[in-house]
Amino acid sequence: MLAKRIIPCLDVTGGRVVKGVNFLELRDAGDPVEIAARYNGQGADELTFLDITATSDGRDLILPIIEAVASQVFIPLTVGGGVRTVEDVRRLLNAGADKTSFNSAAIANPEVIDAASAKYGAQCIVVAIDAKRRTPEEAARPGPDGAPRGEGWDVYSHGGRKNTGLDAVQWAAEMARRGAGEILLTSMDRDGTKSGFDLALTRAVSDAVSVPVIASGGVGGLDDLADGVQQGGADAVLAASIFHYGEYTVAQAKERMAARGIPVRL
């Protein structure tokens, strides 16, 4: 079994790392370059950098900050937020990113994943999916075939502001077919709540795709990370709050996972 990865996440807006609850109530967590260097030193397997307001603000990529972060880390760096085109992938790779993450742009134009993967390889194309469990009212609404949609999760775009009506599990499968090398799966219901991953969502997507799935949204303790792997079927686990505010270190997270029989790089 391959080692499971622990990935701290930097949600960035206005040049600062922030953390919210359910994608709202953002709280400052510090300077992205300093925080990235800290996680690099703690032994994180990878780092994810998400410009969380680039798409909703219609802004360009913040290349100077990305270059500064890339200069401080010697582990794979994934950058997302405002990635719209194959040309954006080139610009980010040149700025020091190892992988690029598409979200809203893939929803607007799914073919961009085919094109980016064909040009740069699936290994550097991540598709981020922000998913929210359907309300009973949403589940009762008819789907494309006229039957009630039923329980499940919908995909949201524009930083979690817009329900696309896409089914999260089906969307993940389509993105993998089109050439995504990895799925970054965030539960909006659990984001920042510290109540653990949405394991049913994680498992449903993990079972539907053959590419690695990164579980995100809801980590409150070290056992939540292990549960994401053992119960959710995730290949990697992403967390922010528990690391940013000093509750736990990456090393402690790896020790707990190893103690539960999960292979990690110590």
UniProtKB/Swiss-Prot annotation:
Note the coiled coil stretches, chain numbering: none
Where is the protein found, in the record's own terms? Cytoplasm
| InterPro entries hit by this protein | Aldolase_TIM (IPR013785), His_biosynth (IPR006062), HisF (IPR004651), IGPS_HisA/HisF (IPR050064), RibuloseP-bd_barrel (IPR011060)
SUPFAM superfamilies the UniProt entry points to: Ribulose-phoshate binding barrel
Q: Kindly identify the residues recorded as the active site.
A: 11, 130
Q: Which UniProt keywords apply?
A: Amino-acid biosynthesis, Cytoplasm, Histidine biosynthesis, Lyase
Q: According to its UniProt record, which reaction does this protein catalyse?
A: 5-[(5-phospho-1-deoxy-D-ribulos-1-ylimino)methylamino]-1-(5-phospho-beta-D-ribosyl)imidazole-4-carboxamide + L-glutamine = D-erythro-1-(imidazol-4-yl)glycerol 3-phosphate + 5-amino-1-(5-phospho-beta-D-ribosyl)imidazole-4-carboxamide + L-glutamate + H(+)
Ranges for region Disordered: 134-157
Any keyword Cytoplasm?
yes
**Membrane-spanning segments:** none
Q: In which pathway does it act?
A: Amino-acid biosynthesis; L-histidine biosynthesis; L-histidine from 5-phospho-alpha-D-ribose 1-diphosphate: step 5/9
* E.C. numbers: 4.3.2.10
A Pfam family this protein belongs to? His_biosynth
Cellular component terms (Gene Ontology): cytoplasm
Which GO terms of the molecular function aspect are on file?
imidazoleglycerol-phosphate synthase activity; lyase activity
Signal peptide boundaries: none
Offer one example of a GO biological process linked to this entry. Answer: L-histidine biosynthetic process
What does it do? IGPS catalyzes the conversion of PRFAR and glutamine to IGP, AICAR and glutamate. The HisF subunit catalyzes the cyclization activity that produces IGP and AICAR from PRFAR using the ammonia provided by the HisH subunit.
The record's PANTHER family line, in alphabetical order, gives: IMIDAZOLE GLYCEROL PHOSPHATE SYNTHASE HISHF (PTHR21235:SF2), IMIDAZOLE GLYCEROL PHOSPHATE SYNTHASE SUBUNIT HISF/H IGP SYNTHASE SUBUNIT HISF/H (PTHR21235)
Subunit and interaction comment: Heterodimer of HisH and HisF.
Protein name, UniProt field: Imidazole glycerol phosphate synthase subunit HisF
- Its gene name is hisF
